[in-house]
Protein backbone atom coordinates (compact mmCIF):
# COMPACT_ATOMS: atom_id res chain seq x y z
CA UNK A 1 0.00 0.00 0.00
CA UNK A 2 2.87 2.36 0.83
CA UNK A 3 4.47 1.63 -2.56
CA UNK A 4 1.22 2.36 -4.38
CA UNK A 5 0.81 5.61 -2.44
CA UNK A 6 4.33 6.69 -3.39
CA UNK A 7 3.63 5.92 -7.05
CA UNK A 8 0.45 8.01 -7.00
CA UNK A 9 2.27 10.94 -5.37
CA UNK A 10 5.09 10.79 -7.92
CA UNK A 11 2.54 10.57 -10.73
CA UNK A 12 0.87 13.79 -9.59
CA UNK A 13 4.21 15.57 -9.11
CA UNK A 14 6.08 14.63 -12.27
CA UNK A 15 3.02 14.87 -14.50
CA UNK A 16 3.73 18.59 -14.78
CA UNK A 17 7.18 18.18 -16.34
CA UNK A 18 6.60 15.96 -19.38
CA UNK A 19 3.76 17.62 -21.33
CA UNK A 20 4.05 18.99 -24.87
CA UNK A 21 0.71 20.54 -25.81
CA UNK A 22 -1.17 22.82 -28.21
CA UNK A 23 -4.02 25.05 -26.99
CA UNK A 24 -6.36 27.34 -28.96
CA UNK A 25 -9.04 29.80 -27.84
CA UNK A 26 -11.12 31.12 -30.73
CA UNK A 27 -14.12 33.41 -31.14
CA UNK A 28 -16.67 32.40 -33.78
CA UNK A 29 -18.89 34.77 -35.74
CA UNK A 30 -21.68 34.31 -33.18
CA UNK A 31 -19.39 35.74 -30.51
CA UNK A 32 -19.06 32.40 -28.73
CA UNK A 33 -15.71 31.41 -27.25
CA UNK A 34 -14.41 27.94 -28.17
CA UNK A 35 -11.42 26.40 -26.43
CA UNK A 36 -9.53 23.41 -27.82
CA UNK A 37 -6.42 21.53 -26.80
CA UNK A 38 -4.21 18.58 -27.66
CA UNK A 39 -2.75 16.86 -24.62
CA UNK A 40 0.67 15.53 -25.59
CA UNK A 41 2.24 13.67 -22.69
CA UNK A 42 5.14 11.29 -22.09
CA UNK A 43 8.14 13.04 -23.65
CA UNK A 44 11.31 10.97 -23.04
CA UNK A 45 9.38 8.48 -20.91
CA UNK A 46 10.24 5.37 -22.91
CA UNK A 47 10.39 5.10 -26.72
CA UNK A 48 9.29 1.74 -28.18
CA UNK A 49 11.42 1.17 -31.28
CA UNK A 50 9.26 -1.71 -32.47
CA UNK A 51 5.97 0.20 -32.53
CA UNK A 52 7.45 3.72 -32.85
CA UNK A 53 5.41 4.94 -29.89
CA UNK A 54 6.02 6.55 -26.51
CA UNK A 55 5.41 3.91 -23.86
CA UNK A 56 3.89 6.25 -21.26
CA UNK A 57 1.60 7.89 -23.82
CA UNK A 58 0.21 4.51 -24.84
CA UNK A 59 -0.49 3.61 -21.21
CA UNK A 60 -2.11 6.91 -20.24
CA UNK A 61 -4.31 7.10 -23.33
CA UNK A 62 -6.27 4.18 -21.87
CA UNK A 63 -6.87 6.14 -18.66
CA UNK A 64 -8.40 9.35 -20.01
CA UNK A 65 -11.54 10.32 -18.09
CA UNK A 66 -13.98 13.23 -18.12
CA UNK A 67 -14.83 14.34 -14.59
CA UNK A 68 -17.73 16.32 -13.18
CA UNK A 69 -16.69 18.03 -9.97
CA UNK A 70 -19.58 18.62 -7.57
CA UNK A 71 -20.11 20.48 -4.31
CA UNK A 72 -23.24 19.23 -2.63
CA UNK A 73 -25.83 18.86 -5.39
CA UNK A 74 -24.21 21.47 -7.61
CA UNK A 75 -21.79 20.85 -10.48
CA UNK A 76 -18.89 23.28 -10.02
CA UNK A 77 -16.78 22.44 -13.06
CA UNK A 78 -15.78 19.78 -15.58
CA UNK A 79 -12.30 18.52 -16.39
CA UNK A 80 -10.41 15.98 -18.46
CA UNK A 81 -7.86 13.96 -16.49
CA UNK A 82 -5.77 10.86 -16.58
CA UNK A 83 -7.23 8.59 -13.90
CA UNK A 84 -5.34 9.09 -10.64
CA UNK A 85 -4.29 12.68 -11.33
CA UNK A 86 -6.00 15.06 -8.90
CA UNK A 87 -4.97 18.42 -10.35
CA UNK A 88 -6.62 20.10 -13.34
CA UNK A 89 -4.82 20.84 -16.62
CA UNK A 90 -7.89 20.88 -18.88
CA UNK A 91 -11.35 22.03 -17.83
CA UNK A 92 -14.18 24.53 -17.91
CA UNK A 93 -16.81 26.11 -15.71
CA UNK A 94 -20.08 26.49 -17.68
CA UNK A 95 -20.90 30.14 -18.17
CA UNK A 96 -17.66 31.41 -16.61
CA UNK A 97 -14.40 30.33 -18.17
CA UNK A 98 -12.26 27.55 -19.63
CA UNK A 99 -8.69 26.70 -18.83
CA UNK A 100 -5.75 24.67 -20.14
CA UNK A 101 -2.10 24.48 -19.13
CA UNK A 102 0.87 24.01 -21.46
CA UNK A 103 4.38 23.36 -20.25
CA UNK A 104 6.86 26.16 -20.89
CA UNK A 105 10.28 24.84 -21.83
CA UNK A 106 12.88 26.84 -19.95
CA UNK A 107 16.36 26.21 -18.54
CA UNK A 108 15.20 27.68 -15.22
CA UNK A 109 12.56 25.00 -15.08
CA UNK A 110 10.42 22.83 -12.89
CA UNK A 111 13.09 20.53 -11.52
CA UNK A 112 14.79 23.52 -9.90
CA UNK A 113 11.45 24.55 -8.42
CA UNK A 114 10.86 21.01 -7.22
CA UNK A 115 14.23 21.07 -5.44
CA UNK A 116 13.36 24.41 -3.80
CA UNK A 117 9.97 23.10 -2.65
CA UNK A 118 11.14 19.71 -1.35
CA UNK A 119 14.64 20.43 -0.07
CA UNK A 120 14.69 24.16 0.70
CA UNK A 121 11.12 24.25 1.99
CA UNK A 122 9.89 27.11 -0.20
CA UNK A 123 6.16 26.51 0.23
CA UNK A 124 5.21 29.79 -1.46
CA UNK A 125 5.61 28.04 -4.81
CA UNK A 126 2.42 26.52 -6.20
CA UNK A 127 2.02 23.30 -8.16
CA UNK A 128 0.70 24.09 -11.62
CA UNK A 129 -2.04 21.48 -11.80
CA UNK A 130 -3.22 22.05 -8.25
CA UNK A 131 -3.43 25.79 -8.91
CA UNK A 132 -5.73 24.98 -11.82
CA UNK A 133 -8.00 23.07 -9.49
CA UNK A 134 -7.99 25.95 -6.99
CA UNK A 135 -9.13 28.35 -9.72
CA UNK A 136 -12.14 26.20 -10.56
CA UNK A 137 -13.10 25.54 -6.95
CA UNK A 138 -13.23 29.30 -6.33
CA UNK A 139 -15.68 29.70 -9.26
CA UNK A 140 -13.86 32.73 -10.63
CA UNK A 141 -14.75 34.85 -13.65
CA UNK A 142 -12.47 35.21 -16.67
CA UNK A 143 -10.90 38.41 -15.32
CA UNK A 144 -10.51 37.02 -11.80
CA UNK A 145 -8.96 33.83 -13.14
CA UNK A 146 -6.52 35.79 -15.29
CA UNK A 147 -5.43 37.90 -12.32
CA UNK A 148 -5.01 34.93 -9.99
CA UNK A 149 -2.93 32.96 -12.49
CA UNK A 150 -0.84 35.95 -13.56
CA UNK A 151 0.30 36.72 -10.01
CA UNK A 152 0.84 33.17 -8.71
CA UNK A 153 4.36 31.97 -7.88
CA UNK A 154 4.87 28.60 -9.58
CA UNK A 155 7.15 25.64 -9.09
CA UNK A 156 7.47 25.23 -12.86
CA UNK A 157 7.25 27.74 -15.73
CA UNK A 158 3.99 27.38 -17.61
CA UNK A 159 1.49 28.81 -20.06
CA UNK A 160 -2.06 29.27 -18.80
CA UNK A 161 -4.57 29.54 -21.64
CA UNK A 162 -7.91 30.97 -20.50
CA UNK A 163 -11.18 31.48 -22.36
CA UNK A 164 -14.25 33.41 -21.25
CA UNK A 165 -17.80 34.01 -22.46
CA UNK A 166 -17.56 37.53 -23.89
CA UNK A 167 -16.09 38.99 -27.06
CA UNK A 168 -12.30 38.94 -27.04
CA UNK A 169 -12.00 36.85 -23.87
CA UNK A 170 -9.06 34.68 -24.77
CA UNK A 171 -5.59 35.03 -23.25
CA UNK A 172 -2.25 33.25 -22.98
CA UNK A 173 -0.54 33.91 -19.64
CA UNK A 174 3.20 33.26 -19.79
CA UNK A 175 4.71 32.52 -16.39
CA UNK A 176 8.28 32.07 -15.20
CA UNK A 177 9.14 29.92 -12.22
CA UNK A 178 8.82 31.67 -8.85
CA UNK A 179 7.70 35.04 -10.24
CA UNK A 180 4.59 37.11 -9.52
CA UNK A 181 4.88 38.75 -12.95
CA UNK A 182 3.45 37.51 -16.24
CA UNK A 183 3.20 38.28 -19.94
CA UNK A 184 -0.38 38.41 -21.26
CA UNK A 185 -1.10 37.74 -24.93
CA UNK A 186 -4.73 38.45 -25.84
CA UNK A 187 -6.81 38.08 -28.98
CA UNK A 188 -6.62 41.82 -29.45
CA UNK A 189 -2.83 41.93 -29.57
CA UNK A 190 -2.37 38.70 -31.52
CA UNK A 191 -0.31 39.64 -34.59
CA UNK A 192 -1.74 36.72 -36.57
CA UNK A 193 -5.44 37.53 -36.12
CA UNK A 194 -7.66 39.25 -33.54
CA UNK A 195 -10.13 36.39 -33.13
CA UNK A 196 -7.98 33.65 -31.62
CA UNK A 197 -4.88 32.83 -29.58
CA UNK A 198 -2.73 29.74 -30.12
CA UNK A 199 -0.03 28.42 -27.81
CA UNK A 200 2.38 25.49 -27.96
CA UNK A 201 5.40 25.22 -25.64
CA UNK A 202 7.52 28.20 -26.63
CA UNK A 203 7.16 31.94 -26.04
CA UNK A 204 4.97 33.36 -28.81
CA UNK A 205 7.19 36.42 -29.28
CA UNK A 206 10.15 34.20 -30.26
CA UNK A 207 10.68 31.88 -33.21
CA UNK A 208 9.87 28.23 -32.49
CA UNK A 209 12.80 25.78 -32.71
CA UNK A 210 13.26 24.01 -36.04
CA UNK A 211 12.90 20.61 -34.38
CA UNK A 212 9.48 21.38 -32.86
CA UNK A 213 7.41 23.86 -34.84
CA UNK A 214 3.76 23.03 -34.24
CA UNK A 215 2.93 26.73 -34.02
CA UNK A 216 3.36 27.65 -37.69
CA UNK A 217 1.19 24.79 -39.05
CA UNK A 218 -1.39 25.66 -36.39
CA UNK A 219 -1.61 29.28 -37.52
CA UNK A 220 -1.74 28.24 -41.19
CA UNK A 221 -4.66 25.91 -40.46
CA UNK A 222 -6.52 28.55 -38.44
CA UNK A 223 -6.24 31.06 -41.29
CA UNK A 224 -7.39 28.46 -43.80
CA UNK A 225 -10.45 27.73 -41.66
CA UNK A 226 -11.27 31.40 -41.00
CA UNK A 227 -13.40 32.85 -38.23
CA UNK A 228 -16.67 32.28 -40.08
CA UNK A 229 -16.07 28.52 -40.08
CA UNK A 230 -14.83 28.05 -36.52
CA UNK A 231 -16.59 25.13 -34.84
CA UNK A 232 -15.81 21.99 -32.87
CA UNK A 233 -15.38 20.14 -36.17
CA UNK A 234 -12.90 22.58 -37.70
CA UNK A 235 -10.90 22.99 -34.49
CA UNK A 236 -10.66 19.21 -34.26
CA UNK A 237 -9.29 19.15 -37.81
CA UNK A 238 -6.70 21.80 -36.94
CA UNK A 239 -5.54 19.77 -33.95
CA UNK A 240 -5.52 16.58 -36.04
CA UNK A 241 -3.10 18.04 -38.57
CA UNK A 242 0.51 16.87 -38.34
CA UNK A 243 2.74 17.84 -36.59
CA UNK A 244 0.16 19.43 -34.26
CA UNK A 245 -0.97 15.83 -33.94
CA UNK A 246 2.08 13.71 -33.13
CA UNK A 247 3.24 10.55 -31.38
CA UNK A 248 2.81 12.14 -27.96
CA UNK A 249 -0.84 13.13 -28.47
CA UNK A 250 -3.15 11.28 -26.09
CA UNK A 251 -6.39 13.21 -26.54
CA UNK A 252 -8.09 16.27 -28.00
CA UNK A 253 -10.63 18.25 -25.97
CA UNK A 254 -13.10 20.81 -27.33
CA UNK A 255 -15.01 23.22 -25.06
CA UNK A 256 -17.77 25.78 -25.62
CA UNK A 257 -18.08 27.84 -22.45
CA UNK A 258 -21.20 29.71 -23.59
CA UNK A 259 -23.13 26.50 -24.24
CA UNK A 260 -21.57 24.50 -21.40
CA UNK A 261 -20.38 21.78 -23.75
CA UNK A 262 -17.24 19.64 -23.77
CA UNK A 263 -16.13 16.78 -26.03
CA UNK A 264 -12.98 14.67 -25.69
CA UNK A 265 -11.52 12.30 -28.27
CA UNK A 266 -8.67 9.84 -27.88
CA UNK A 267 -6.02 10.58 -30.48
CA UNK A 268 -3.28 8.46 -32.03
CA UNK A 269 -0.92 9.53 -34.80
CA UNK A 270 -0.37 6.41 -36.90
CA UNK A 271 2.44 5.95 -39.39
CA UNK A 272 5.20 8.38 -40.24
CA UNK A 273 4.48 11.04 -37.60
CA UNK A 274 6.63 13.49 -35.71
CA UNK A 275 7.72 12.04 -32.34
CA UNK A 276 6.63 15.34 -30.69
Could you say what each language-model-derived stretch is?
Residues 1-20, 130, 134-276:
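C-terminus-biased signal that marks the final domain/tail of proteins
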Residues 1-127, 155-157, 250:
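A contiguous strand-loop segment
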Amino acid sequence: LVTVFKQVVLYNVFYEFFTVCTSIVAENEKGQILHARNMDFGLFLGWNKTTSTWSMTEVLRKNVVELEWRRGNKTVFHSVNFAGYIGVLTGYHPGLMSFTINERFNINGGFIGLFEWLILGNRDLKWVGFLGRDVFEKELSFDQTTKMLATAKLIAPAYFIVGGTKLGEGVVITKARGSTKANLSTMKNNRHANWYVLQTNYDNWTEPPFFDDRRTPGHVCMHQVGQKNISFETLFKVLSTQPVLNKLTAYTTLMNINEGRMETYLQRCVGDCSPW
